Amino acid sequence: TDISTATHQTDGAAVVLSAPKGVTNALSLLCEQAAAGEDFQPLFNKLNDTVTGIANNLNEELDGFAHASVVEFINSHLSVLKQHLEGIKLLGVAPDNVAAGILSIGEYISVTLFSAMLSAKGIANRVIDPVKYVLAEGDYLDSIADVSLSKARFSDVPTDGSEFLVMPGFVAANEEGEKVTLGRNGSDYSAAILAACIDANCCEIWTDVDGVYNADPNQVEGAVLLDKLTYQEAMELSYFGAKVLHPKTIGPIAQHHIPCLIRNTLNPAAPGTLISNEKSEVWTSVKGISQLDNVTMFNVAGPGLKGMVGMASRVFEVMSNANISISLITQSSSEYSISFCIQSKDASRALTLLEDAFALELQNQLLDPIEVRHDLAIVTLVGDGMRQTKGLAARFFNSLAQARVNNVAIAQGSSERSISTVIESKRAKKAVKVIHQNFFSDRHTIDVFLVGCGNVGTELL
């Protein structure tokens, strides 16, 4: 709360909270156990101990903490949770609409705890229920918010700093008023939505790293923290695997030109990374390298594709109707084949859908059997300055050759802001290291093999 209350004291604040650590995973596992007919009581008890333990600790630390009402809220929600789990156990499946309600319990508990903390410190606050304010459409478990329509609903929310606004993340409602969730990184997405809806001056996302790096610091030694990114650069990096941000999060803040600052809760003194329309004072053609893992590539080919209007759109319509996101697309100039990449978790379903949709063409050999290639990764080079710098593509592919990596497919957008290659997953880590070294490092690593350690060899060592 120190970070949030300090902000409120200077300029007012609104805070979006995610669930306590481990709670969402526990809720997901409870659904799985119940659907499988397993005994979920031990995990349920552990979850109960976790959240009530947080409330008990806060009660000891803060005078005036509304312990009784907080515990009553927790018990009420866990009682409803248990009823849902019993129903899932009888059904043998967790319906998506029920799962959405279950998975969001942690966020509501976080908000209740946080609101009680603020009240104990004498800070006026208001809890915003996103089910009332945030309108979304799509799957129950991965919806997309309609920011324009949602913004109109926020007309009664004070933005003058008189009240500290607190909202659960990860949650919204569909047109029927049913609770839905916003998918991976849902709380960050919720923060961007709230920032847009209340015309915030800045959206700060507090995470467990110092900001956005020019490569994954867990894989690349010497990865450098980026001080600034444009919205477009951030979108490209996040879309192709940068784990700090999700592409959905960038959309609302870019559309409404709201600066977004990525900060570290464990290191609040770190400056973080600013995402805005501003460009870094130090000009660089390339900003970063991202890696998207667990990719499967489909190749749809055959004489039926050439000159046939609408064949490509049919392929993508099949994916769209199944809510399967396509990461990368390439098409041969001969129009004989079209290739695209999706997340591997969707591969089996996608193949079945394509074979059903094109059964007649496959039967009459207008299309070849659909090729599927697993265990791939997409490595992408990103930077606004790429379009003004000649020879970057050559350096990129020379780096891949240096790493002894073959390209499965290549794609570049017309904006020339990024260039991507599809490669084997097992070679991705090596590829990223070599690319980073060639584009960002002044020091280059070489391998030296010394055979025979006589006087000269010993002196060299």
Stretch-by-stretch model annotation:
Residues 270-460:
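A conserved regulatory-domain signal marking ACT and ACT-like small-molecule sensing domains
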